[in-house]
Amino acid sequence: MIKKTFIWDFDGTLVDSYPAILESLEVTYQHFHLPFDRVAVEKYILEKSTGDLLLDLEKAYGISFEDLKKKQSLEQAARDDSIVLMPGAIEVLEWARKEEIQNFIYTHKGATTASVLERLGISDYFTEVITSANSFIRKPHPQAIDYLVEKYQLVKGDIVYIGDRKLDMDLAFEADISSINLTQGENEHNRKISELTEVLGVFN
């Protein structure tokens, strides 16, 4: 048995949801009559987050973040059925279950995360799922991680945060836990993988 705890990011890590996110943003931009550059927007949300993008739009155009977020969330929820699992996700989750590794999710996605997990048949793999509906301070602030550590008496030295953006790696650093990341390079705090099944090789 491997003494580890996995905390997973959701969008772009466990599921391929960026096409749905980009479509929801395009419709949101159109609704508020804003110029939409798909390449630039995709680059921005991969480097930062959708929330940061909407905050920038609020500052640039004077449209309230709440109105932008409400519209974008509605449009994304309407596209949740198009979200699919990332290759290797089930294999890694099954392996983690056999190794008695506890799994959690911490994502900026909203309350519809639960229904997506149910539809994809993976909700039972996770002890708890934290979303934006929990109202923790956003990544990379470690508040949500600290909540899980305290609630479940987790050992930080055993926790790995698995994500796909610099924001996820920064969260792990701020929370003083290990990082495995699909895009960020190797360093003393992070292990880079190119696909999820490489997680097995990290611990086998």
What are the residue ranges of the model-derived segments?
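Asp-based, Mg2+/Mn2+-dependent phosphohydrolase catalytic module
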Residues: 1-4, 30, 94-97, 110, ...
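A generic secondary-structure micro-motif detector
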Residues: 15, 43, 82, 103, ...
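Secondary-structure boundary/capping motif
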Residues: 16-17, 105, 114, 140
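Short glycine/serine/threonine/alanine-rich loop segments
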Residues: 34, 63, 101, 154, ...
